[in-house]
Amino acid sequence: MESQRNILLIGLLFVSFLLWQQWQADKAPKPVATESSLVANAANSHSADVPEADTGVPAAVTATSKLITVKTDQLDVQINPIGGDIVFAALVSHKMEQDKDQPFVLLEQTKDFTYIAQSGLIGRDGIDSSAKGRAAFSTAATEYTLAEGQDTLEVPLTYVADNGVTYTKVFVFHRGKFNVDVDYKINNTSAAPLQVQMYGQIKQTIKPSESSMVMPTYRGGAFSTQDVRYEKYKFDDMAKSNLNQATLGGWAAMLQHYFVSAWIPPATDSNTIFSSVSAGGLANIGFRGAVYDIAPGATQEISSQFYVGPKDQKALSAISDTLNLVVDYGFLWWLAVPIHWLLMFYQSFVGNWGMAIILITLTVRGLLFPLTKAQYTSMAKMRNLQPKLTDLKERFGDDRQKMGQAMMELYKKEKVNPMGGCLPIILQMPIFIALYWVLLESFELRHAPFMLWIHDLSVQDPYYILPLLMGVSMFVMQKMQPIAPTMDPMQVKMMQWMPVIFTVFFLWFPAGLVLYWLVGNIVAITQQKIIYAGLAKKGLK
């Protein structure tokens, strides 16, 4: 009977997790704007100067302003010389679809969709603003390629203002990396002082997330400040309230499941993280940097970083100590992080993510074996106590208080813990949920094959074979458990339907997660046989 209740407990916890997850998606708390006194002056500097979002392909992209193409070992990028915006970015080492050679396109600008990275100089003498328009840069070439043996590639853009001041905007690409340095060099050859402020923003057409209850993915904004290490800021949040948070350092990003684009200004600079939504349905999130005063004859350099690539925790941590938090493992992050590390460790040896998941399963089941043994021992003792419990029920009838006291005395005398059978189940659920988020958030598992028909462990089994096998394994486990004659008939019927219900739920779960549960069931069946054989020798059935 205890085993049957445990399976019901699994079902209850499982459904509760799904409902809680959906509630979190609908009722996520909104961040509260706060300002640090150290950088309060930067919060409102030239906030209206940042160019508004444009819709569609800008008219400035004409035959006389040909896009600048940049190719590295990781990125295929196009830069618009009007403003120097990154209007296209394809990730060379990541495919759009597993069975096609087309690289994954993260940034693009078409007639119907915009997702670009914009940067510029605003302020009193800025060359980019909603009122003045954008600077028209010139460049020595329109095609740049990172050559063999070359570690960095510089793409310089030059603009000479009416007052003779030269503005040089340099994009620096690195071999093996997805981050781009964006550097401004201002040579003030005029007779008057200049005042400028750098900004960087990401613009994206508001597009619904391809999320579901069992596969909740996030598409929207995120930011970090000195007061808020990491906060998602959904498109709905942007439409309701504009961000305007002063901070030292910080970053602003757009997330799209396994991928992220982010502006990361210098950690020691006074910046303002902002967001807005245009009437045309474009969401903006970005930063405004510190204000620089440049004396006549002086030269000033202003820098920032832009990342456009996968949610690679190692690469993101090297850029900012909080940028890796975009890999959001939820409230069980403290458990998911070591699981991810162990998964990576196993994969480095076996070279197969499916085998790594199997090894994770064996590790978890091995660690929990002492508790599992105690669980089945407790269940066997409870079954042997059934005649005595029945006698107590007949003796005390409806007097629940006396019956409860008598039962507790009996448990104490026989050294039986009535809750002993639940502990392993309760301990397994956090591990299951943490692994669920690891599979959902870790880009390494995108398009990761296992064997045979499983070509991508991060999506559902295309033929539903694993969920069906998982359901069969649950049915076998159920049949191995004796049903107590005193068990409620309604509970018996619910138990009979549990394998079917779980199979239906797992049809849409990532194949890697179903593999974990299936292998776990097979190991549990094996452990159950071994434990029952040992209990039989002790006279426990």
Curated annotation (Swiss-Prot):
InterPro entries registered for this protein in UniProt: Membr_insert_YidC, Membr_insert_YidC_N, YidC/ALB3/OXA1/COX18, YidC/Oxa/ALB_C, YidC_ALB_C, YidC_periplasmic_sf
Pfam families xref list: 60KD_IMP, YidC_periplas
Membrane-spanning ranges: 6-26, 325-345, 349-369, 420-440, 457-477, 500-520
Tagged with keyword Plastid: no
MF GO annotations: membrane insertase activity
Keywords: Cell inner membrane, Cell membrane, Chaperone, Membrane, Protein transport, Transmembrane, Transmembrane helix, Transport
GO biological process terms on file: protein insertion into membrane; protein transport
CDD domains: 5TM_YidC_Alb3, EcYidC-like_peri
Keyword Ribosomal protein attached: no
Topology in the lipid bilayer: Multi-pass membrane protein
Assigned GO CC terms: plasma membrane
Location of the protein in the cell: Cell inner membrane
Subunit structure: Interacts with the Sec translocase complex via SecD. Specifically interacts with transmembrane segments of nascent integral membrane proteins during membrane integration.
NCBIfam families: PRK01318.1-1 (NF002351), PRK01318.1-3 (NF002352), yidC_nterm (TIGR03593), yidC_oxa1_cterm (TIGR03592)
Family of the protein in this entry: Belongs to the OXA1/ALB3/YidC family. Type 1 subfamily.
Role this protein plays: Required for the insertion and/or proper folding and/or complex formation of integral membrane proteins into the membrane. Involved in integration of membrane proteins that insert both dependently and independently of the Sec translocase complex, as well as at least some lipoproteins. Aids folding of multispanning membrane proteins.
Protein name: Membrane protein insertase YidC
Source species: Shewanella baltica (strain OS155 / ATCC BAA-1091)
Origin organism lineage: Bacteria, Pseudomonadati, Pseudomonadota, Gammaproteobacteria, Alteromonadales
